[in-house]
């Protein structure tokens, strides 16, 4: 059964201040006011399918919007939940913008998942990003959401100026320890018009290479998925508008593709795939498996199996 996320964007809405890296105008899509029209379009094309779906409010800081505004947005979705056309609501917010009372209120209004814009659990990088809270606030927020019965995701950055592999994997270990339902991994990019651009122009910032980022993230995804934690997204969403505004840091429109390819390449080599063998892989990994087989000049057969974990290759006997 296919699962859809129907996203709406609250550009900067509710944010107590602007983080150093952020330009949501370059990243955002449908405004939240278009809930009804977007839902009707979605149902027109997918209503006859066997599917599950969630409406998502991203961008901004949902839980710091005026409560009346939050209620309007949530209630705009509830009729579709009542008709079983949508199964729940998710939103993104800051770790320092939630408490137990709010979580009870959200749970009673069909919120099924909250993504926390943690970015990092390390003080020096939180200070660099001007997030305005200490690492323990992020840890506590993840635990608080989990205890409420609402699903929780963590958004994590990498590629800070001067960051090494050890520092990045301190953050990955935090994810493994806290064990959210899923996470997003995306590299820090310098976007034109952000406060980070000013700092970049005023001094030297050293960023890791694309090849290094792919290696780090492939290693991270491997251990995260082994622990049963989902990967919601790798890299920033691709858009021509965003590409035009990135002036430094890490960005590639096919970053996730490069990571997934690297993971399958490792599995292919480890499995010792021979000529004419039949491989069993997750359906999402079919394209990578065929690409690697062509690259290695191997004639193979591939069988998809959705019960397999991503990046796994089994040889059918």
Question: In which residue ranges do the predicted regions lie?
Answer:
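Short acidic/His/Gly/Ser-rich catalytic and metal-binding motifs that mark active-site loops
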Residues: 15-19, 191-199, 242-244
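Canonical Radical SAM [4Fe-4S] cluster-binding loop centered on the CxxxCxxC motif
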Residues: 2-34
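Conserved non-cysteine loop/helix-boundary elements of the Radical SAM core domain that shape
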Residues: 27-37, 45, 59-188, 192-214
């Amino acid at each position: 059964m296919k699962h859809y996320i129907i996203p709406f964007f609250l550009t900067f809405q509710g944010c107590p201040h602007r983080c150093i890296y952020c330009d949501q105008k370059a990243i955002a899509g449908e405004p939240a006011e278009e809930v009804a029209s977007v839902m009707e379009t979605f149902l027109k094309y997918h209503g006859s399918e066997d599917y599950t779906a969630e409406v998502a409010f991203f961008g901004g800081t949902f839980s710091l919007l005026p409560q009346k505004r939050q209620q309007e947005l949530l209630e705009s979705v509830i009729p579709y939940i009542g008709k079983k056309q949508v199964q729940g609501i998710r939103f993104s917010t800051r770790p320092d913008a939630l408490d137990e009372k709010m979580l009870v209120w959200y749970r009673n209004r069909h919120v099924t998942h909250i993504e926390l814009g943690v970015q990092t659990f390390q003080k020096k990088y939180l200070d660099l990003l001007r997030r305005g809270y200490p690492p323990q606030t992020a840890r506590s927020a993840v635990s608080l959401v989990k205890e409420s019965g609402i699903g929780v995701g963590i958004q994590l950055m990498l590629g800070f100026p001067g960051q090494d592999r050890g520092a990045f994997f301190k953050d990955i270990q935090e994810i493994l320890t806290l064990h959210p339902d899923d996470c997003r991994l995306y590299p820090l990019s310098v976007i034109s018009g952000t406060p980070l651009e000013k700092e970049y122009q005023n001094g030297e910032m050293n960023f890791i290479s694309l090849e290094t980022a792919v290696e780090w993230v492939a290693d991270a995804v491997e251990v995260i998925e082994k622990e049963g934690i989902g990967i919601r997204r790798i890299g920033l969403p691709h858009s021509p508008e965003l590409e035009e505004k990135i002036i430094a840091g890490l960005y590639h429109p096919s970053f996730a593709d490069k990571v997934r390819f690297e993971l399958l390449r490792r599995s292919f080599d480890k499995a010792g795939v021979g000529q004419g063998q039949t491989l069993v892989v997750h359906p999402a990994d079919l394209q990578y498996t065929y690409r690697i087989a062509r690259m290695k000049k191997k004639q193979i057969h591939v069988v998809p199996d959705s019960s397999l974990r991503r990046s796994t290759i089994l040889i059918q006997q």
